[in-house]
From Swiss-Prot:
A motif (Prevents secretion from ER) lies at residues 435-438. The gene is ILL1. This is IAA-amino acid hydrolase ILR1-like 1. Keywords: Endoplasmic reticulum, Hydrolase, Manganese, Metal-binding, Signal. SUPFAM superfamilies: Bacterial exopeptidase dimerisation domain, Zn-dependent exopeptidases. Residues 1-20 form the signal peptide. InterPro entries: Amidohydrolase, Bact_exopeptidase_dim_dom, ILR1-like_Hyd, Peptidase_M20, Peptidase_M20_dimer. Mn(2+) 2 binds at residues 136, 138, 196.
Amino acid sequence: MALNNFLTFQLLLLLLRVSSESPWIVAGDVSRIPINFLELAKSPEVFDSMVRIRRKIHENPELGYEEFETSKFIRSELDLIGVKYRFPVAITGIIGYIGTGEPPFVALRADMDALPIQEAVEWEHKSKNPGKMHACGHDGHVAMLLGAAKILQQHRQHLQGTVVLIFQPAEEGLSGAKMMREEGALKNVEAIFGIHLSPRTPFGKAASLAGSFMAGAGAFEAVITGKGGHAAIPQHTIDPVVAASSIVLSLQHLVSRETDPSDSKVVTVTKVNGGNAFNVIPDSITIGGTLRAFTGFTQLQERIKEIITKQAAVHRCNASVNLAPNGNQPMPPTVNNMDLYKKFKKVVRDLLGQEAFVEAVPEMGSEDFSYFAETIPGHFSLLGMQDETQGYASSHSPHYRINEDVLPYGAAIHATMAVQYLKDKASKGSVSGFHDEL
């Protein structure tokens, strides 16, 4: 009997030891959840899965609102881990749900569209779709969110509310976030978090700031119409080329002479099209470009239109101006909520170390995450993957690559932010409604 008791005791000790060494959290160990998520994300089970997902999506890039195969693949991964979801939302978008199905609700977002770029990186998983490439890290964003979903689903019994997973189409200029918002993606959601990989931020560090982070963005296109004719007798023409040249130069004054130096704005002409012969003055010239601003966006648009039309008139030409060419609606600035910024900063330091958080500076780049963040409290951040020995190219470059070693950091931050937000919110009490889908 004594021998049996001794063996039973030794067996219990062995089980306890194995349990303590396992990264997967057992019931009753809720306090360890945020601390353990980075360890879990780095485990072969999660890390290998994220790498596989990222490479699969990278090989098959699809443009905005055309992410049919990408969406199908994401849904299959959600099915594998038993996560319920709603589809379609905004044509190809997906909304997944993990947790109680009850308040509070917090959302995590990943974009999934590619860019019309021919990949120049030669490697085993190079894009198989000519002229299309994941050159902005969206394949990594999806992989990180699915990694977080895997971790959260394994610990769903500990969630004090519901995590909403938003897989968004068409971030690159087509305002997919706006369409998802219009189709109810934020129903009952009280806060939303987004992460973007950054080749300019040191590896493993997260950058953010409170307030305006990403500029509002818009586009413009103008057709300047004159009267074409032979280039040898310009006096018999009304030259739209000269008018367009004057317009391009005059637009530069909007920033250098009309903008407070402490208030960043950008107006850039990116295309000038017209004419097809050396000895013919064309009837018209088309110009177009982009504008970025944190404040005074509407006024900047009005001045662009005014300068184009009046400079054209000075040169006896007419001008028509389109401030939403190709359906590209102006995008508001991305503004980080102060309370969420404080939570994010604390989570990053607790999870990755005190030096892991970097105070960012405002970016003139734009993000349609802004449509979510102007509706409910939101927080957008950059996750660094910079490695000077590797020389990672900037976003939107045909040479763009991802440092896959950073994927666990993104998954862990996603999961920890969701758990911590729900924990804090539940402790204060939440009055939101229920999701009909759950």
